[in-house]
Each structure stands twice: as structure tokens, then as C-alpha cells.
């Protein structure tokens, strides 16, 4: 029973070559349950949309028995997002966000990859450590023209990997970048935060001919190229070194200053941008990695500390890099949307099920985000709420989709046989 709009059903057909016929039927039912809200409280509840001869046990088989490749699903989802957003002509540079998030399962036992993680925000009545899963997610960052006629950064999830002991998050980001199978001939820039940008990540991205843009700590040491070489002996690889928080004080003559405006703390503010080409040490054995160090200062906010950014894409302008990094916060919006869809509600215990469930949630969030930004055109009824005027947010679009589907809570039984 296909209750979803025909546009979404047509888009799901792109995933049919990745699985068998009976598996694709279960895949469609799970996506229907996720979008409508039934699968959030139990995957087997997606079988209410199935015909009478469908066995609900096949829902569990999708996560454990059937041969479904999460890597192929993520690669196909990435290709679908790029094709819907840009058509046949891709821009010369694409931005991607990588970050990690946690799902809390305080009473779970004997579930694959369940661990204790440091709780980033204090919750009254909860322990300092969080028991649950950690996911490393990737999202495509692009600009969208909103209802007010302004260009805004938005992002759509394209894949997720499950954190396991023995693997670092930067290494998982590099693995995720390889599994997305991004198109060649395009400059792909990965935007990460201070806890992820590191030498293992830079090595992994360099092997893929991709680039990184991230915020570094104030004590990050960078090097300048040597200005003078000795007449005899070995050539110098590195020149003077300096911490990024001391660049303005020690080497103001080597920095290029620019002025621009950026949306900071709720309003447009003037910012000062200082950048210089530097060298990073330890990424490649015996060789330096060229990068650009960027210092961002907001003069109107005296208590706001400067931002220290580093990018390995030397062709990316400093102002464009700062604006792109400002869009990194969109991944937090994606995490809220994914958790609302049920990222932490999967009740299975197998590792394959935990991994596949995260990919299905990413697919559902990407479809809703593309529809909310007008990339996917859906004819859905409006709710006309007096207390909430916006109809194109992801949450409101999902409620409109539920109103359109009006799912039945009982299954259609076959007619009894007559003798």
C-alpha cells in the first residue's frame, strides 16, 4: 500500500538496483514508516502499510539477514542529492560537513557498539557519562534562497558510520569520505570542528584529493616557508614557527587583512579577516603540507574570542572560507531532525541493524530537507496553524506529509474463501 506521494516513490526507485525485489519492498515500507512516524517506536510497525500476505518478520530480516550494503546506499543517496540539487552541472567546489553525535540508551544491554561517552552538556539528574551510540555523519552543505529572498546555508545528511572502539573519529571521517564516492574533477572541501581536524584526517583527505576546512585550537603551531636557504648543506623545509593566536602580534607584515560582514549572534556584524599561507608539519613524512591560516575577529563583540581556521584548499578565498565555516552549524540542525525521526529509537541488538538504521534515517532526513528547500516539489495540504505560520520547515513538512498520507492503523485482510 503506497501512501507516499508519487514523487517520493519515484525517487526511491533509484535504490531498487541495490537489493532484491522482496528486500526493496521492505525497504519501501521502512521509509514509509520513518516518514510517517510509525517506525520510530518500533520497526515492525511499518508493516501496517503492507498488504495482507506480507510477513512482519521480514522487517527484522532487513536489518540482520538480508544482504544490504550501507556503503552503496550512502553512495546512491549522495549521487541523488547532488543530481536533484544541481542537475547535470556541478559547481567547481562542493562543501561537506562532518561531525559526530550521540544517541542515549541508558537502560540498553547487550547491544553492539554500545559505550560510555562524555556528556558535552550537563543534564540535571543524569551522570557525567552518556550510555549509548556514537555516529559520525556527513552532510552536504549548500545555499538556499529563503522566503525573505536571502541566501541561507542548509545541509542534508548523506551518510553515517557507527563509532566502534579502536577507531578514531577523524579516521572514520576519512573512511566516510571514501565511501560516499564523490564525483571526480570537483574540489571537495570538508568542514569540521576543532575536535576532528587532525593529521589522520588530513592524510586521508589528501589521499582522496580532497580538502579540509576547520577550526583549530589557539595553541596550534604553524610554520612559514623559509625565506633564506643556506648555500651549503640540506635545504630548509620549514621557516619560523608560531602559534596561531600569536600571528597578529608577531607577524603582522605577513598577514593579509580584509573586511567583510557575517551573521554573528543574531545580526549582521562587521568582521576583520587576516590570512596567510603557512606550512603544517607531521602530516606527510619529510614533507610539509601547504595550508592557509585564517584569523577572524569581530570588533563589535569584545568578549568573543577570535576564530582560528585552517584550510588546505589554497584556491579558496579567505572570505568564502569564513562564510562556509559559518554554515557548519547546520549539521546540528540535521542532528535534531534525525533524532526526531528516530535515530536513537532502534531497538535491535545487531551491529548491522544499528548501522543500517542510521543510513535509513539519513535518507529520510535528506528527502525532507530537499523538499523543505524546494528542491523536491511536493503537493501537500497546508496546516494553516495560527500559532505557527511557517509551512516549509522540515518538521512542519513532515506533519503535512502525515496529513496527506493519513495512514491506517489496521491492515487490510484478504476476503474469506467461498466453498
Which role does the model predict for each range below?
Residues 54-57, 99, 193, 332:
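Residue-level detector of functionally special positions within alpha-helical transmembrane segments
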Residues 50, 80-84, 175-180:
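A generic secondary-structure signal
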Residues 43, 55, 77-78, 92-96, ...:
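Generic hydrophobic, aliphatic-rich segments that mediate packing or membrane embedding
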Residues 31, 35, 44, 59-63, ...:
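Long, contiguous hydrophobic alpha-helical segments, chiefly transmembrane helices and signal peptides
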Residues 31, 64-151, 279:
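Active-site-proximal, Lys/Arg-enriched surface segment
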Residues 1-19, 28, 35, 92, ...:
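Single, function-defining residue in the core of a domain
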Residues 1-66, 70-71:
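Gly/serine-rich nucleotide phosphate-binding loop at the start of the catalytic core
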Residues 32-44, 76-80, 128-140, 248-254, ...:
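Short N-terminal helix-initiation segments at or just after the protein's N-terminus
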Amino acid at each position: 500500500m503506497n501512501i507516499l506521494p508519487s514523487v517520493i516513490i519515484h525517487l526511491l526507485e533509484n535504490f531498487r538496483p541495490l537489493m532484491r525485489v522482496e528486500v526493496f519492498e521492505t525497504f519501501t515500507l521502512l521509509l514509509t514508516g520513518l516518514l510517517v512516524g510509525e517506525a520510530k517506536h518500533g520497526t515492525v510497525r511499518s508493516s501496517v502499510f503492507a498488504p495482507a500476505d506480507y510477513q512482519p518478520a521480514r522487517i527484522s530480516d532487513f536489518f540482520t539477514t538480508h544482504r544490504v550494503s550501507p556503503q552503496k546506499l550512502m553512495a546512491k543517496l549522495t549521487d541523488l542529492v547532488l543530481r536533484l540539487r544541481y542537475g547535470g552541472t556541478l559547481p567547481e567546489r562542493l562543501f561537506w560537513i562532518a561531525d559526530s553525535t550521540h544517541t542515549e540508551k541508558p537502560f540498553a544491554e547487550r547491544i553492539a557498539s554500545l559505550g560510555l561517552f562524555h556528556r558535552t552538556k550537563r543534564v540535571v539528574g543524569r551522570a557525567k557519562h552518556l550510555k549509548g551510540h556514537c555516529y559520525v555523519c556527513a552532510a552536504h552543505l549548500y545555499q538556499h534562497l529563503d522566503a525573505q529572498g536571502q541566501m541561507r546555508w542548509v545541509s542534508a545528511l548523506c551518510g553515517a558510520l557507527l563509532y566502534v572502539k579502536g577507531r578514531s573519529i577523524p579516521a572514520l571521517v576519512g573512511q566516510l569520505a571514501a565511501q560516499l564516492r564523490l564525483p571526480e574533477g570537483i574540489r571537495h572541501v570538508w568542514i569540521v570542528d576543532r575536535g576532528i581536524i587532525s593529521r589522520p584526517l588530513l592524510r586521508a583527505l589528501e589521499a582522496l584529493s580532497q580538502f579540509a576546512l576547520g577550526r583549530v585550537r589557539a595553541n596550534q603551531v604553524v610554520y612559514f616557508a623559509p625565506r633564506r636557504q643556506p648555500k651549503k648543506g640540506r635545504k630548509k623545509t620549514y621557516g619560523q614557527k608560531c602559534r596561531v593566536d600569536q600571528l597578529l602580534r608577531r607577524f603582522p607584515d605577513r598577514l593579509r587583512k580584509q573586511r567583510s560582514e557575517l551573521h554573528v549572534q543574531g545580526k549582521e556584524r562587521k568582521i576583520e579577516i587576516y590570512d596567510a599561507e603557512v606550512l603544517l608539519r607531521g602530516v606527510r613524512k619529510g614533507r610539509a603540507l601547504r595550508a592557509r591560516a585564517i584569523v577572524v575577529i569581530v570588533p563589535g563583540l569584545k568578549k568573543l574570542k577570535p576564530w582560528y581556521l585552517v584550510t588546505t584548499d589554497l584556491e579558496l578565498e579567505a572570505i568564502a572560507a569564513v562564510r562556509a565555516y559559518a554554515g557548519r552549524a547546520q549539521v546540528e540542525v540535521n542532528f535534531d531532525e534525525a533524532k526526531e525521526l528516530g535515530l536513537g529509537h532502534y531497538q535491535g541488538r545487531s551491529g548491522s541493524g544499528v548501522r543500517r538504521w542510521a543510513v535509513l534515517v539519513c535518507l529520510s532526513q535528506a528527502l525532507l530537507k530537499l523538499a523543505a528547500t524546494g528542491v523536491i516539489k511536493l503537493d501537500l495540504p497546508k496546516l494553516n496553524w495560527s500559532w505557527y505560520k511557517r509551512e516549509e520547515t522540515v518538521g512542519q513538512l513532515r506533519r503535512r506529509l502525515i496529513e496527506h498520507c493519513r495512514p491506517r492503523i489496521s491492515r487490510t485482510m484478504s476476503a474469506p474463501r467461498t466453498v
